[in-house]
């Protein structure tokens, strides 16, 4: 077993009444209902141990500003192993699909880290590649999107980035 530290960033969190109306526990099983509501009731901007194996850090804020060094109020940007990029389509949320954001996400991923998104458009794939990722198109989930993208920060890319930084000092 591995311990999981999950950070979720939500600009417009759902009200508890809306969560109850959605009734997701009937999909995940009533045995998980208590955990489901514990996750949603966890306080914002603080780490919460949901179980000995799962720590949750919910951030209420604008994702595009949290990783912007000029606008960011947090003192340090954490590093991640996996980023599940679940934004609306580029036509609906263009600010979430800018090259500078993918460049930053690349930087906050650990070596070998993965970014995955349901948006498999060519323009998104090319932006991820420009940021330095190795990108693969994979079959989407059953009953959902036809394809997804998996972008990996490869060892070679990470080594080149590290070598470039050390040569600048």
Where are the language model's segments positioned?
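A short helix->loop->beta-strand "cap" motif at the edges of active sites that frequently abuts
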Residues: 2-4, 109-113
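Short SAM/SAH-binding signature in class I
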Residues: 56, 78-87
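Conserved beta-strand signature within the Rossmann-like core of class I S-adenosyl-L-methionine
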Residues: 82-84, 111-119
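A short glycine-rich, Lys/Arg-flanked "PGG" loop and its adjoining helix->strand segment in the class I
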Residues: 95-111
